[in-house]
């Protein structure tokens, strides 16, 4: 798809305040518009954008906690250069995860715009082993993208994207510490966790910026 906006109802039935998740037309009129800042993220394709990348941008731009409150944050990961109906743009995109989502909430931004196929890393989506469909798509080598990722980065790195692998490797307690706030509101922790952290706190999203 082209550039589009996400509202809470896209990924959840209830927001963190316990109220029914809102549709786009129920969001404030200024939720998607306002003063914006662009972070140029130093990340390779298929990389996971974390709070560490975002903290590095804050330092580089001379920003401090609180400076982004109420603003729109645009992420330039370089993925826009690959825009196409292709594996390079979809299967192997850089993207965010739970740590970035919590960071956005902490900083109080009102909208996050991503220059890639989704806010979340592709392995956090149904392209990998998440969601009702769990497609685990074939990659460029003819193997699944899960197999490819494990071969390149190892099982522990992959576990970040897979609830059952995370629990197997790190244990239930570690999983609950990292993803428990999502599970507590009835959503699957490793399935688009950045979306859910943001949108569940009323922070809207833009994809394919």
Task: Show which residues each predicted segment covers.
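Active-/binding-site microenvironments in catalytic and ligand-binding cores
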Residues: 1-209
């Amino acid at each position: 798809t082209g550039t589009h906006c996400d509202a809470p109802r896209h990924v959840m039935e209830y927001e963190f305040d316990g109220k029914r998740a809102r549709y786009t037309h129920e969001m404030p009129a200024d939720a998607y518009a306002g003063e914006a800042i662009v972070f140029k993220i130093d990340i390779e394709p298929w990389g996971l954008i974390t709070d560490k990348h975002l903290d590095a941008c804050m330092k580089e731009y001379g920003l401090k906690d609180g400076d982004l409150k109420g603003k729109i944050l645009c992420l330039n990961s370089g993925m826009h250069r690959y825009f196409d109906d292709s594996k390079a743009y979809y299967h192997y995109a850089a993207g965010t995860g739970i740590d970035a989502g919590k960071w956005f909430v902490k900083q109080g931004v009102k909208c996050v715009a991503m220059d890639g196929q989704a806010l979340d890393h592709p392995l956090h989506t149904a392209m990998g082993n998440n969601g009702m469909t769990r497609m685990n798509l074939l990659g460029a080598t003819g193997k699944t993208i899960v197999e490819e990722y494990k071969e390149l980065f190892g099982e522990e790195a992959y576990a970040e994207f897979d609830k059952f692998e995370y629990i197997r490797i790190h244990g239930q307690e570690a999983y609950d510490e990292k993803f428990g706030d999502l599970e507590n509101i009835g959503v699957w922790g490793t399935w688009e966790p950045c979306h859910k952290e943001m949108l569940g706190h009323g922070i809207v999203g833009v994809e394919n910026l």
